[in-house]
């Protein structure tokens, strides 16, 4: 499960690098993955790899 958000299941996107002459070369846009620890209802801790965007959303909802 490399380079995937474990909550939203988002993965890397593909696109192009563009030079000044507008030459296109393939590249990959990776997520900003961070490791967080969440507590389950039973009090058990689990570690997840989530993107910074998901982490921000969880903080907004009061989960982190």
UniProtKB/Swiss-Prot annotation:
Signal peptide: none annotated. One of its GO terms (biological process) is translation. SUPFAM superfamilies: L28p-like (SSF143800). Keywords: Ribonucleoprotein, Ribosomal protein. One of its GO terms (molecular function) is structural constituent of ribosome. Residues 1-23 are annotated as: Disordered. GO terms for cellular component: ribonucleoprotein complex; ribosome. InterPro entries: Bacterial_rp_bL28, Ribosomal_bL28, Ribosomal_bL28/bL31-like_sf, Ribosomal_bL28_bact-type, Ribosomal_bL28_sf. The keyword Nucleotide-binding does not apply. Belongs to the bacterial ribosomal protein bL28 family. This is Large ribosomal subunit protein bL28. It comes from Mesomycoplasma hyopneumoniae (strain 7448). The lineage of its organism: Bacteria, Bacillati, Mycoplasmatota, Mycoplasmoidales, Metamycoplasmataceae. The gene is rpmB.
